[in-house]
Amino acid sequence: MIGFEIFLAIGMFTAIVLGLVAIILVARAKLVSSGDVTIQINGEHSLTVPAGGKLLQTLAANNVFLSSACGGGGTCAQCKCVVVDGGGEMLPTEESHFTRRQAKEGWRLSCQTPVKQDMQIRVPEEVFGVKKWECTVESNPNVATFIKELTLRLPDGESVDFRAGGYVQLECPPHVVEYKDFDIQPEYRGDWDKFNMWRYVSKVDETVIRAYSMANYPEEKGVVKFNIRIASPPPGSDLPPGQMSSWVFNLKPGDKVTVYGPFGEFFAKDTEAEMVFIGGGAGMAPMRSHIFDQLRRLRSTRKISFWYGARSLREAFYTEEYDQLQAENPNFQWHLALSDPQPEDNWTGLTGFIHNVLFENYLKDHPAPEDCEFYMCGPPMMNAAVIKMLTDLGVERENILLDDFGG
């Protein structure tokens, strides 16, 4: 009798387990997509892809690269596209990025949209001009205390067909990087010692993608050049250092870097209006690209000025290049302002924050600042201060162009 009860108990337990397994398998079949699905793009292109991933990564795996400054984190909203059919309901992580009208039109963040079934989507046509390269580090020196000038050499015969002010995406592999291994030139090591920057370690377990504005202009062929600032944790915080910038600061000549692009929206308007460029920090990159393009490639006769803010002379770079441009082009002037000049600078030039310097030394006496076009890229506080100052002067928002990536 006891043996029968044991056998019955084992049988019932086995039946329950098998029943639960069956339920899980049925649920998995309904909730987790498998097999292949078809993605129709712009009614002209078709991809057959495995189901189960996110739309952004699925497209990238098939050489259709949407911009994603945050690397698919759902924060930058650069990877937006229109899902005509097959994307399911918009997720809460997407809602804040779209108006109600856009939501009704099918706008989605591709990094948040699951690929579960056949889909129809629309993307900008220029996406099909985006390419992927494996580039080689040509040089990576400091140009300021916390800014590197990274120059990447493209494969032989390759070029990036970009417009001044454009950007590309860099791919950073999983890594462990120790700041003590960074190659920092002697003239910049003082602040690294002062803030004990050498103690940081960057540990990254998955591939990271970030967007960076290019510092070169279209006629500087065969290379892509960037000004990249190290993203160190705020003092007293337990936050990790920047994943991509830590990896970039450790790059040496000969290292390989995967690049996607080009992308961009921060382009110069094709008008005859006066151009005023305002920059700070690593926001130098798109400023250089634009100004060199206007004066060297386009031979523009538009009135152009550049206002750049740095803490001290050690933090200012490309100064000789701008001096030469100014000497060669009577329609161009540039102005460097230092917010904290050091005794060794022997500085007799402009001082203060760049938005105040620009206002006091130029715009307050300008006959029509509202007729100018303003192009800016710098730290967030600088951008906000400049935008407020320009708005107070009556400049329309359409004439204030901002690059959020470079600073």
From Swiss-Prot:
<keyword id="KW-0520">NAD</keyword>
<dbReference type="InterPro" id="IPR001041">
    <property type="entry name" value="2Fe-2S_ferredoxin-type"/>
</dbReference>
<keyword id="KW-0915">Sodium</keyword>
<comment type="similarity">
    <text>Belongs to the NqrF family.</text>
</comment>
<dbReference type="InterPro" id="IPR017927">
    <property type="entry name" value="FAD-bd_FR_type"/>
</dbReference>
<dbReference type="InterPro" id="IPR012675">
    <property type="entry name" value="Beta-grasp_dom_sf"/>
</dbReference>
<keyword id="KW-0812">Transmembrane</keyword>
<keyword id="KW-0285">Flavoprotein</keyword>
<feature type="binding site">
    <location>
        <position position="76"/>
    </location>
    <ligand>
        <name>[2Fe-2S] cluster</name>
    </ligand>
</feature>
<dbReference type="Pfam" id="PF00970">
    <property type="entry name" value="FAD_binding_6"/>
</dbReference>
<dbReference type="Pfam" id="PF00175">
    <property type="entry name" value="NAD_binding_1"/>
</dbReference>
<protein>
    <recommendedName>
        <fullName>Na(+)-translocating NADH-quinone reductase subunit F</fullName>
        <ecNumber>7.2.1.1</ecNumber>
    </recommendedName>
</protein>
<keyword id="KW-0997">Cell inner membrane</keyword>
<feature type="domain" description="FAD-binding FR-type">
    <location>
        <begin position="130"/>
        <end position="269"/>
    </location>
</feature>
<dbReference type="GO" id="GO:0016655">
    <property type="term" value="F:oxidoreductase activity, acting on NAD(P)H, quinone or similar compound as acceptor"/>
</dbReference>
<keyword id="KW-0411">Iron-sulfur</keyword>
<feature type="binding site">
    <location>
        <position position="111"/>
    </location>
    <ligand>
        <name>[2Fe-2S] cluster</name>
    </ligand>
</feature>
<dbReference type="InterPro" id="IPR017938">
    <property type="entry name" value="Riboflavin_synthase-like_b-brl"/>
</dbReference>
<feature type="binding site">
    <location>
        <position position="70"/>
    </location>
    <ligand>
        <name>[2Fe-2S] cluster</name>
    </ligand>
</feature>
<dbReference type="GO" id="GO:0046872">
    <property type="term" value="F:metal ion binding"/>
</dbReference>
<dbReference type="InterPro" id="IPR008333">
    <property type="entry name" value="Cbr1-like_FAD-bd_dom"/>
</dbReference>
<keyword id="KW-0274">FAD</keyword>
<dbReference type="GO" id="GO:0051537">
    <property type="term" value="F:2 iron, 2 sulfur cluster binding"/>
</dbReference>
<feature type="transmembrane region" description="Helical">
    <location>
        <begin position="6"/>
        <end position="26"/>
    </location>
</feature>
<dbReference type="InterPro" id="IPR039261">
    <property type="entry name" value="FNR_nucleotide-bd"/>
</dbReference>
<keyword id="KW-0479">Metal-binding</keyword>
<dbReference type="Pfam" id="PF00111">
    <property type="entry name" value="Fer2"/>
</dbReference>
<keyword id="KW-0830">Ubiquinone</keyword>
<keyword id="KW-1003">Cell membrane</keyword>
<dbReference type="InterPro" id="IPR010205">
    <property type="entry name" value="NqrF"/>
</dbReference>
<dbReference type="GO" id="GO:0006814">
    <property type="term" value="P:sodium ion transport"/>
</dbReference>
<dbReference type="InterPro" id="IPR001433">
    <property type="entry name" value="OxRdtase_FAD/NAD-bd"/>
</dbReference>
<keyword id="KW-0472">Membrane</keyword>
<keyword id="KW-0739">Sodium transport</keyword>
<dbReference type="GO" id="GO:0005886">
    <property type="term" value="C:plasma membrane"/>
</dbReference>
<feature type="domain" description="2Fe-2S ferredoxin-type">
    <location>
        <begin position="35"/>
        <end position="127"/>
    </location>
</feature>
<keyword id="KW-0408">Iron</keyword>
<keyword id="KW-0001">2Fe-2S</keyword>
<comment type="subunit">
    <text>Composed of six subunits; NqrA, NqrB, NqrC, NqrD, NqrE and NqrF.</text>
</comment>
<keyword id="KW-1278">Translocase</keyword>
<keyword id="KW-1133">Transmembrane helix</keyword>
<dbReference type="GO" id="GO:0009055">
    <property type="term" value="F:electron transfer activity"/>
</dbReference>
